[in-house]
């Protein structure tokens, strides 16, 4: 039993004898076992709010205030304790032996009086009125006084105010104050609304490096590349006297090859500033070549921005299934950015195998096939159909094709009786195949690619018992072949692609990737893949090299996709193919997608 002590209000007992002011008086009984039960009472936030409210009333009436903050000549009576409790800036000022800790009036420079007024309102009430007129000054004030909650509220308010007319200015403000999230949101907003943003005054005030960052982005949201060119020219003409020398650097980020040919001739080549800028002529020449050669000529400027609806995709044509012996009819495209595979029209020659495939402009050419086929088909990427075109003069399989200067070359192969040194060239305008100078050495299953205006035939099998390490180079101007530096290894069923004036070779049941520089006639080892493969598909897409499928040491086909980035040397695995495949065609084209297109 517990006795509760209390105080009797009437100091006279019933007998008239006064008692002690504090007496023992049993009010009620409770078991001791309940003493561990505790009631933790809390009034919630209402208590702290009411205390702050009283302190704010004290501030308004200058009651108990012990410091005056002076800003731009305007005085704000405050309580040191309240300021110190809210701000580490003031806590350091008042709690250490600084001069301000002893002074009645403390002057603060570098901020606005109105911003200080709003700041103090927040300190004493937890509320602040943020507007478009005061947000910048209030942000700077809260940053100075290290009030992160108010600072973050200002940043959030700025994010909600983003508009094509102010997003660039807000991004510059965010960068200046290390607001990474806000800066990122501003940049994303500007990329998504670039055509509108480019019409406003802030765009004309961009620094060259800031403008280049936007122009270089694949995520720039436009319906056509002409919008980018026009934005650049407006920026240059806005301060033409001192911006003229920057024109070439800016145009390097404009994808001139993707402009409509009529627009390019009339508007770009017709511009007086460009006509008087010889340093830009190489960029114009690149665009003209692309208009003629299509995807044969690849550079960062030939890669479509995704918002146009077009993207570079890898198309895999046919091939053999896991254990061989069954030819696949599928034509499928792979988008490395999204990781998606999409089925296209099945190719008509799927009953054959070991045919050759290459990309011509934005279409796909398929020729030959086992046994001794001379048929040639063209896949029209716009119509998604296969069309018969002129047949080869000589049927073959285990040959290779590539495109050089707008024409298709079918090289070497096997006709069922002998290995071929025969080379044919196809002109799509006349729909005709003609023979050119034969190879120095007949080979089948070589690696073939074009680079620096010449055709390279690398390795291959000169007979059924050996492999060649020779590199045969064809010059279309002289219609002649020369031998170049030999391949560092001798393996069958290798593959080659060219990128940035260099040739890359892989496959042949080796993990190695080799690079050949035609200008130096020199080979170098540049990397390793994850597994040994032969008869794999190789294609350049978005500035990287993709190795797809192939046959391993156990003879089984693979569905692996490996990406090699020559700029960094990094090799990664990406989305697997729909099925294992080898001896397949593999090319890169531009493909339109409604999901990506911005109307």
Curated annotation (Swiss-Prot):
Kelch repeat windows: 313-362, 364-406, 407-453, 455-501, 503-543, 545-591
Q: Which residues form a coiled coil?
A: none
Any one GO BP annotation for this protein: heart development
Q: Which residues form the BACK domain?
A: 167-269
The protein's UniProt keywords, in alphabetical order, are: Cell junction, Cell projection, Cytoplasm, Kelch repeat, Repeat, Ubl conjugation pathway
Question: Where is it localised?
Answer: Perikaryon; Cell projection, Axon; Cytoplasm; Cell junction, Desmosome
For the BTB domain, which residue ranges apply? 65-132
Just give the chief location class. other
GO MF term (any one) = ubiquitin-like ligase-substrate adaptor activity
Effect of disrupting the coding gene? Morpholino-injected embryos show heart function anomalies detectable after 48 hpf. Heart defects initially manifest as pericardial edema, changed heart rate and reduced blood circulation, and later result in ventricular failure and blood circulation block.
Its signal peptide is: none
What InterPro entries does the record tag this protein with?
Answer: BACK, BTB-kelch_protein, BTB/POZ_dom, BTB_POZ_KLHL24, Kelch-typ_b-propeller, Kelch_1, KLHL24_BACK, SKP1/BTB/POZ_sf
Alphabetical list of Pfam families matching this protein: BACK, BTB, Kelch_3, Kelch_KLHDC2_KLHL20_DRC7
The record's subunit annotation is: Forms homodimers. Component of the BCR(KLHL24) E3 ubiquitin ligase complex.
Q: What is this protein called?
A: Kelch-like protein 24a
């Amino acid at each position: 039993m517990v006795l509760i002590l209390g105080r009797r209000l009437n100091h006279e007992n019933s007998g008239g004898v006064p008692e002690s002011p504090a007496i023992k008086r049993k009010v009620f009984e409770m078991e001791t076992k309940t003493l561990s039960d505790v009631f933790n009472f809390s009034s919630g936030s209402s208590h702290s709010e009411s205390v702050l409210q009283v302190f704010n009333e004290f501030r308004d009436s200058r009651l108990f205030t012990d410091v005056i903050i002076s800003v731009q000549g305007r005085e704000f009576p405050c309580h040191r304790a309240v300021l110190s409790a809210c701000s580490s800036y003031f806590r350091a000022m008042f709690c250490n032996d600084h001069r301000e800790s002893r002074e009645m009036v403390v002057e603060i420079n570098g901020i606005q009086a109105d911003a200080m007024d709003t700041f103090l309102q927040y300190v004493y009430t937890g509320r602040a009125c943020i507007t478009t007129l005061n947000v910048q000054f209030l942000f700077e004030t809260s940053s100075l006084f290290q009030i992160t909650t108010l600072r973050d509220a200002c940043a959030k308010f700025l994010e909600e105010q983003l508009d094509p007319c102010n997003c660039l200015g807000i991004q510059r403000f965010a960068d200046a104050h290390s607001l990474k999230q806000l800066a990122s949101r501003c940049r994303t907003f500007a990329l998504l609304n670039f055509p509108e943003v480019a019409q406003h005054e802030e765009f004309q005030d961009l620094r060259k490096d800031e403008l280049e960052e936007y122009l270089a982005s694949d995520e720039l949201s436009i319906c056509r590349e002409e919008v980018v060119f026009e934005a650049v020219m407006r920026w240059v003409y806005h301060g033409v006297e001192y911006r003229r020398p920057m024109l070439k650097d800016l145009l390097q980020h404009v994808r001139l090859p993707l402009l409509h040919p009529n627009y390019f001739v009339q508007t770009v080549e017709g511009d007086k500033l460009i006509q008087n800028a010889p340093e830009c002529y190489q960029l114009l020449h690149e665009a003209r070549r692309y208009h003629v050669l299509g995807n044969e000529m690849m550079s960062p400027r030939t890669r479509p921005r995704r918002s146009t609806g077009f993207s570079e995709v890898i198309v895999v044509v046919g091939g053999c299934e896991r254990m061989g012996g069954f030819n696949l009819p599928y034509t499928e495209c792979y988008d490395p950015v999204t990781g998606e595979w999409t089925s296209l029209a099945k190719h008509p020659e799927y009953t054959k195998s070991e045919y050759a495939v290459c990309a011509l402009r934005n279409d796909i050419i398929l020729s030959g096939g086992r046994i001794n086929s001379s048929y040639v088909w063209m896949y029209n990427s716009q119509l998604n159909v296969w069309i018969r075109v002129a047949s080869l003069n000589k049927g073959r399989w285990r040959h290779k094709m590539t495109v050089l200067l707008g024409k298709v070359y079918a090289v070497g192969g096997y006709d069922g009786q002998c290995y071929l040194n025969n080379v044919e060239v196809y002109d799509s305008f006349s729909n005709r195949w003609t023979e050119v100078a034969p190879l120095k050495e007949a080979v089948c299953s070589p690696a073939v690619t074009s680079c620096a205006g010449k055709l390279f035939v690398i390795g291959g099998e000169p007979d059924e018992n050996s492999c060649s390490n020779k590199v045969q180079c064809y010059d279309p101007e002289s219609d002649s072949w020369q031998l170049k530096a030999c391949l560092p290894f001798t393996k069958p069923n290798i593959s080659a692609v060219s990128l940035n004036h260099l040739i890359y070779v892989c496959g042949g049941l080796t993990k190695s990737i080799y690079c050949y520089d035609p200008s130096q006639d020199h080979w170098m080892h540049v990397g390793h893949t994850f597994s040994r493969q032969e008869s794999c598909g190789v294609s350049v897409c978005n500035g990287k090299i993709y190795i797809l499928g192939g046959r391993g040491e156990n003879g089984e086909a693979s569905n692996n996709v490996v990406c090699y980035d020559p700029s960094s040397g990094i090799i990664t695995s990406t989305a697997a193919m729909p099925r294992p495949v080898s001896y397949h065609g593999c090319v890169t084209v531009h493909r339109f997608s409604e999901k990506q297109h911005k109307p």
